[in-house]
């Protein structure tokens, strides 16, 4: 509960900086499944009703997740006011991160490369995304998929 209270105090800019720091620390040739969701409004629940629904699927996925070759990360995008703001100073996730227009969104990264994404993910979507890793690895190893080296090194 203390962690949730600390998140509430962070602005969207602070949260975006945390995401940027995490993204820059991804090691080469590693897989990360990032979940972007609304910050808690009051208490433990997000202001975003779709995020609350998706959290059940994400929770089930986390239980089955152990032993997979992908790291699960969760990122908050700020308050409802910050997310829905139409002002010049838009939410940094919308302004600086391509195509993050909805929450919740799940994005599969190979190092810093955005490989696959799903809006309002369900457990089957998350399992599918992680299953794609084997296919991507096979394509990379066979030379059929040429990932820009700047993303994986």
Specify the residue positions occupied by each region the protein language model found.
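N-terminal organelle transit peptides
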Residues: 1-8, 153
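Thiol-based oxidoreductase modules, predominantly thioredoxin-like and allied folds used
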Residues: 9-10, 37, 62-89
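Short coil/turn segments at secondary-structure boundaries
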Residues: 47, 88, 119-122
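Short, internal strand/loop/helix patches
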Residues: 89-97
């Amino acid at each position: 509960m203390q962690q949730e209270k600390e998140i509430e105090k962070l602005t969207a800019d602070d949260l975006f900086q945390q995401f940027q720091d995490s993204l820059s620390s991804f090691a080469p040739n590693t897989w990360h499944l990032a979940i972007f969701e609304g910050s808690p409004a009051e208490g433990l629940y997000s202001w975003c009703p779709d995020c609350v629904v998706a959290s059940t699927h994400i929770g089930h996925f986390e239980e089955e997740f152990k032993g997979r070759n992908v790291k699960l990360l969760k990122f908050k995008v700020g308050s409802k006011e910050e997310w829905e703001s139409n002002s010049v100073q838009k939410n940094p996730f919308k302004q600086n991160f391509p195509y993050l227009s909805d929450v919740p969104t799940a994005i599969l990264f190979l190092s810093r490369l955005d490989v696959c994404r799903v809006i309002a993910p369900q457990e089957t979507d998350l399992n599918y995304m992680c299953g794609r890793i084997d296919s991507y690895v096979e394509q990379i190893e066979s030379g059929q998929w040429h990932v820009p080296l700047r993303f994986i090194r």
